[in-house]
Structure formats: C-alpha cells, structure tokens
Amino acid sequence: MEEIQRYLQPDRSQQHNFLYPLIFQEYIYALAHDHGLNRNRSILLENPGYDNKFSFLIVKRLITRMYQQNHFLISTNDSNKNSFLGCNKSLYSQMISEGFAFIAEIPFSLRLMSSLSSFEGKNIFKSHNLRSIHSTFPFLEDNFSHLNYVLDILIPYPVHLEILVQTLRYWVKDASSLHLLRFFLHEYWNLNSLITSKKPGYSFSKKNQRFFFFLYNSYVYECESTFVFLRNQSSHLRSTSFGALLERIYFYGKIERLVEVFAKDFQVTLWLFKDPFMHYVRYQGKSIMASKGTFLLMNKWKFYLVNFWQCHFSLCFHTGRIHINQLSNHSRDFMGYLSSVRLNPSMVRSQMLENSFLINNAIKKFDILVPIIPLIGSLAKENFCTVLGHPISKPVWSDLSDSDIIDRFGRICRNLFHYYSGSSKKKTLYRIKYILRLSCARTLARKHKSTVRTFLKRSGSELLEEFLTSEEQVLSLTFPRASSSLWGVYRSRIWYLDIFCINDLANYQ
C-alpha cells in the first residue's frame, strides 16, 4: 500500500484518474494473491493453477498479449477465434479480476485511512474489533430491548449489470478501468449468475471472492447511503460513526427526485423520518431497522425505501420484501442465533407504613437462543447423526488415524461452543456435544471393528478431554467440583471479537 501511495502521490487532485496503468504492474497481482515480493523461494517457479496457485510468468505473458493484440474488442464473429477467450480464459479472467478488485479498492482504502486517522487519539472505536461477527450482538442487547417495531428487509438485487458499473463511477473516475469492468461483466457472467446463488455465478464467486465481494459491497453501500443522508439531515448532533462513510456526487439530485414522490417540501419529508431511536443492522444479504416509534412511522419508512430503490436503481422492488414485525411478538433467525425480545414478569413487594402491596412489573429482555433444529439438520447433512438427532458413525473418516479423527470431531465441537458462547441457555450445545462425541466413538469403533462400549473403556478420559472447550478447561482447573459459581459462569454470555467468518462444518483446513 505504501508503494501504491507513492505512485499516486505526485498529483493528489487527479490520483483517482490513474488506476488503469496499475493493472500492468506485477506487484499488484502479488498483493492481490497475498504473496510477498521478498520471499526466499522464487514465485516464478510456481505452477499455474485455478485455485490457489499463481505464477508471475503467466501474468507477464498475458500483459504482453494485451499490449500486442487488441483482445478487448468484443465481436460476435471472431469471439471463438480469440486466444484470450480460449482455453485459458478462466485463469486469465480470474487473475485480472482479482488484480482489478485490488486496484479498485485503492480509492476506498485511501479515503478510509484518512478518515480513521482523524479519529486517532480520540478512542472512538477500534476497527479491528468491529470486524468480529460477535460485535453486533452486544449492540443488539443494549438497544433492542427498548424498541418496539422492526423492519425485516431483503436487500434488492440489481436488475442490470450496468448498475454495478454506474455505482463505481461515483468513486472511480478512470474510464479505462470502468470499461475493463464492463468487459468482465458482460463477456463472462450474466446478472442471474453473478449475484444470485445459481451454479455458474456460485462457482465464479468461489474463485473470485475478492472481486465478487467488492462489487456486491459497493452496491449495498449505495443502497444504504440514504440512511446516512437522512440521519445527518434530521439530527442536530451528527453521529461520529458515520465519519468513515463518504457521500458521492449527484446524490442530492437523486434525493430531490425522490422527494417529488412524497411531498413538494423537502423539510417536511425529513421531519417524517426524524427518529432518534432508529437503529440499522445489515447481515447476510438482509438488513433490519428497529425503532421505538409507532407502526405508522415504520410503514412510512417501508414505502420510502421502496420508492427510493425504484427511482434510484430503476428496478421493480416489491413491498413484500419488507416486513414490519413487533419485537415482543416475533422471533428471528439472526446470524445462526434465534433472537427475540421477551417480557419477563417480576413481582415486587412494597411496604408503606403498615400497608403492604404487590407490584407487577414486566421488563423487556433481549433473549438469544441456540436453534437446535437447524444445528441437528446441519449435522445430519454432514452424516454425523440422523435427522432425529441420533449419532451415527462417519465412514468417510475411517481411513484416518485415531488422533486425526478425534481432532476433527473435537475441533467442530469447540468451534460450535466458541461461536454460540453468547447464548444464556447452553443445554442445546451440550446435546450437540453429546452427538459429536458419540459419533466420534462410533467412527473409531467402526475403524477398529469393535463396539462403542469396548472402545470407551479402552480410551478412558482421553476422548472426553479432547471435547473440552477452552472455557470448560479453565473452569475445571478453577472449580474442581460443581458449585454455584461454576453453573453461574456456564449460564453467562460471552462474546468474542476474533470471529470473522462462519465456516462450514466440513471445512477442516
């Protein structure tokens, strides 16, 4: 990044207009593939591949071809004869698209660093902690228990590839880079395969994750920009958390066009959505907006979002993709947890002089539970148990060593306990732990052609120790016997700031 900054340093006023020449720099592809330039072994000797291998020699040959021939003229007559679109088009497109994604991130990274540098010394937030998935749940615990209604929103998909190009045009003003992006999108992938989870686009996103996530996040940021705008316009105290979000050109013109749908007076429209208790969270292609306001206010927000996305993105957005739910009467599947706001009744006895009376008090509490049925379904899909939750052996792992089998089962159990540590009721987790432990024992018994009882007698406590989580290991040393303190810790919620992704159960790398 320092070398890129030196490249863009001579003319800061036009630094966003010179991204295209970086495509022909070799170190860009090294950075995109997380290769260091000063390693002991030569990268040039690596074999080219489609998954995780990379070769500078292939990139140099590709760049030479791009200089010698004009491969970017799309023609229906000679597309079959074009060597660039031949047998190696998947490898070439993968390398260039990942390099392009790294280059296109430069304007965003420079602006983000300059914005975060202004917060140094103020201790407003730590960005590396906010990367964790668990960082969202303390925010929900602190705020959602005081709110009434929530909007469950499915983020709309762009109906045309040109929308993705136009979205980046506000940030990257390099016409050559945008033409290259347009070439990738129109030549190799169509809309349905790029954004949705159909097979062609799904394989593309698996191989070009950086490129895919960059395009999708740019589009989602464009969808969310209206919340930043309205929040800053309707609030006298600007929120410092929006300091890293920068507005784009022509946005005010689009807002004024949208205002014509609601009212002639823009200030009246802003007054309708002035809500200091509005909270917004996005996750997994969905988003939720919670408010302390009434059902009428949430209904206004719903139709505002529908009209905004229809006018701004020229797409047909159905109102059925936004649902209004009352927090106290609705449970939702949120990031693998089952979250809800419950009313916990409590009885308070009050004594005044000689008279005593009881006061019924209901307190709202944000409750987070572990969904047992989806977890058992995931374990059944990976052949750890039946659909009813009965443990079975896993014959695919019978060829592995005993230590590898125990380590794989133990890693899955520890990962599940680590992620679902925020649940206050861990009875479900101990049932999952029982399924995995017995499935491990049956797999080992199947390998050694013995019964489960015989194997457990021979292994003793070694198998049990492998399934202990980090919290249980500490508790077993601190509290050698069961006590009230031990069970109190078991019931407590623990949120970790080192969980950045949710891996599949079958991913053991």
Curated annotation (Swiss-Prot):
Transmembrane segments: none annotated. One of its GO terms (cellular component) is chloroplast. InterPro entries: Domain_X, Maturase_MatK, Maturase_MatK_N. It comes from the Eukaryota. The keyword tRNA processing applies. GO terms for molecular function: RNA binding. Keywords: Chloroplast, mRNA processing, Plastid, RNA-binding, tRNA processing. The keyword Chloroplast applies. This is Maturase K.
